[in-house]
Amino acid sequence: MALDFLQKKAGIGETTQDKIGGGSFIINSGAYPAKVTKAYLQQSNSSSAVAIVFEFKLPDDKTLNETIWVTNGKGENFYVDQKSGKPAYLPGFELASNIAYVTTGKELAALTPEDKVIEIYNSELKKKAPTPVKMLMDIVDTELIVGIQKVVEFKQAKNQATGKYEDTAETRETNEIVNVFNIAGFTALEAKSEAKELDFIIKFKEVYTAEFVRDKTKKAKAAGTTTPNQGVTTPSLF
C-alpha cells in the first residue's frame, strides 16, 4: 500500500506546526525526548478516513499512544477553510507529516508501509490478538522530542440510537501531542529552512509548563458541543 494519497498539494502552505496552541498514565505538559516504537495505518470502518497509530516510549519507561487522523472521510488530507475559501491541510496530517520529517527527513508520502503482525486489542474478543497491520518501519525506532499538553475533557459514550460517541457529564485527564521536534530541538519547518539557532521550542516550553492544562470542557459547555482535537477548527473527518 503506497502512501500516494498523502502527497502534499501545490498551493497549500504548511502552517500548523509552528503555532503555540491553546496511555494509561497522565504526564504534565512539556517537551519530552521519545522513541517511536510503533507507527501503523488504521482504516476507518465507516468511511475512507485513515489514521496513523503511534506508540512512543518516554522517559521513565512510560508509553504514550496517539491515533492521528491524516485524511477525512473522503480520503483527502486537506479541507477548504470556510472563512478564506482556501484549502488547508488537516491538522492531523500536518502533525503526522512533521513526525515523519523530524525523524527521517522524508515527507510522509515518501514512506513505504510494510506488512507486520502485532498484538492489538480486539473489541469482539475483548483481549489483545495478533493483527496484520501496515507498519511505517522508516519511523520505528527513531527518536524525536514530543511537545505534549495535559487536557481535561468530557468522557464519551456511544449513543445507542445514533451509533455515534457523545459527551457525558464525566470528565477525564489525558495527553495530546501538539508539536514535534527533531532531537536537536528544531521543528520540521525550521529543519527545512536549515535554521541554525533554536527558537520555537524555547517559546513552546515557556507556554507549556508543567502547570499548563487545556480545559476543553469550558469551551464545550459554552458552545454546547465538543471541541475538535488539537485546538484547530476543522470539518468532520467522517
Task: Go through each PLM region and give its residues.
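Short beta-rich binding modules
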Residues: M1-F238
